[in-house]
Amino acid sequence: MTSSRLSLAADARDSILSHAREGAAGDPPAEVCGVLAGDSDARTVTAAHPVSNVAAEPRVAYELDPEETVSILEAIESAGDDAVGFYHSHPESDPVPSATDRERASWPGYVYLICSPDGRMTAHEWTGDEFRELSVAVE
């Protein structure tokens, strides 16, 4: 992946934000997460697939449920699409990579989209050493 831009389908954006708002409305608020599907070469996201957050501290961290993630990745591949990356929310902080996000990032070349319940979102490619910010275009 070489583009510095992520194209995000409006339906996928709406799904991600709805999921983030559900997590933020919890008591206590919790980060939500999921898998982004589409065309990895074009860096285009056409669908967002929610995955349960199984982190020990879901208010400040996320961990994709491994079994759900494998099932979703298989379904994406079966549909002829690619896993473009992952999304998660920051219900009580800005949508930028946290120290925890940096420590736990483990998929070089994939997109990590972070959103807040107020609709702000950022996207970053994990290089294996750092996050490289991407512009986000909703289409």
Curated annotation (Swiss-Prot):
Cross-referenced SUPFAM superfamilies: JAB1/MPN domain
Activity regulation field: Inhibited by EDTA and N-ethylmaleimide (NEM) in vitro.
Disulfide bond sites: none
GO molecular function, one term: zinc ion binding
UniProt remark on cofactor binding: Binds 1 zinc ion per subunit.
Gene Ontology annotations of biological process type: proteolysis
Active site: E31 (proton donor/acceptor)
pH profile of the protein: Optimum pH is 7-10. Displays little to no activity at low pH (pH 6.5 and below).
Temperature dependence: Optimum temperature is 40-50 degrees Celsius. Is active over a wide range of temperature (20-60 degrees Celsius). However, the enzyme is not active at 70 degrees Celsius.
Motif residue range(s): JAMM motif: 88-101
Keyword line: Hydrolase, Metal-binding, Metalloprotease, Protease, Zinc
Entry's EC annotation: 3.4.19.15
Cofactor dependence: Zn(2+)
Positions of the MPN domain: 6-139
Family annotation (InterPro entries): JAB_dom_prok, JAMM/MPN+_dom, Metalloprotease_DSAMP, MPN, VirAsm_ModProt
Binding site for Zn(2+): H88, H90, D101
UniProt subunit comment: Monomer.
Function: Metalloprotease that displays desampylase (DSAMP) activity, cleaving ubiquitin-like small archaeal modifier proteins (SAMP1, SAMP2 and SAMP3) from protein conjugates (isopeptide- and linear-linked). Thus, likely regulates sampylation and the pools of 'free' SAMP available for protein modification. Functions as a specific and not a general protease since it is unable to hydrolyze a variety of unmodified proteins otherwise hydrolyzed by proteinase K.
Additional remark text: Is optimally active at NaCl concentrations of 0.7-2 M, and displays little to no activity at low concentrations of salt (150 mM NaCl).
Similarity remark: Belongs to the peptidase M67B family.
Protein name: Desampylase
Source lineage: Archaea, Methanobacteriati, Methanobacteriota, Stenosarchaea group, Halobacteria
